[in-house]
């Protein structure tokens, strides 16, 4: 793809997302309201799977033995591009949207302290834009939307890697809400949680 075609494709993707922004903002707001903890994101996963199915994605639920993990495939052939979504909340962070001071929806309830409501919705917007590109151009390519629950506990991605769900990918992309636009290209260590219990006399 030459520079002109690349710029055109990027502009069309951005235009698609802009034209459909209310849909993606509404999804983000729904996930905010659900505020489900790690590996208990049942309504959130159900919402994403429903939307993916309605838009022609081949959805596989309960992957890797995780009830709220899923994939949505669209297209065929190479390249195979994965887009990762997270949607879990944290305990004790319930908050009314738009409030700049503590205003919990439910006192002591769950809330999205890390913006995973936006992370999942933004990833879906990207996947849908790629789907539209594949539809319009009839080009070879597969987009895979990965529902990755339990990020706050370092859970699902490790199990998904163990089961080999990433092996068919040519590239995997994700993003995270923040206060700057930047590309992170470094590496980070794996996360392993271990509980040690010591018995005996100190």
What are these regions (language model features)?
Residues 3-112, 117-141:
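Acidic/His- and Gly-rich active-site-bordering loop/insert found
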């Amino acid at each position: 793809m030459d520079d002109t075609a690349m710029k055109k494709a990027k502009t069309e993707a951005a235009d698609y997302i802009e034209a459909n922004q209310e849909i993606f903002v509404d999804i983000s707001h729904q996930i905010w309201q659900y505020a489900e903890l790690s590996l208990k994101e049942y309504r959130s996963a159900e919402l994403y799977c429903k939307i993916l199915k309605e838009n022609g994605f081949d959805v596989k639920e309960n992957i890797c033995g995780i009830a709220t993990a899923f994939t949505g495939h669209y297209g065929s052939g190479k390249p195979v591009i994965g887009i990762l979504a997270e949607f879990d909340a944290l305990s004790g962070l319930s908050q009314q949207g738009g409030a700049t001071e503590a205003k919990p929806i439910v006192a002591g309830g769950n809330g999205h302290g890390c913006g995973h409501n936006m992370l999942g919705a933004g990833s879906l917007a990207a996947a849908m834009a790629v789907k539209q590109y594949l539809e319009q151009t009839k080009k070879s390519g597969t987009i895979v939307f990965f529902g990755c629950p339990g990020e706050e506990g370092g859970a699902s991605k490790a199990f998904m890697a163990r089961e080999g769900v990433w092996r068919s990918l040519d590239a995997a992309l994700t993003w995270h809400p923040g206060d700057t636009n930047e590309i992170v290209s470094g590496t980070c260590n794996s996360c392993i949680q271990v509980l040690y219990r010591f018995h005996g006399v100190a």
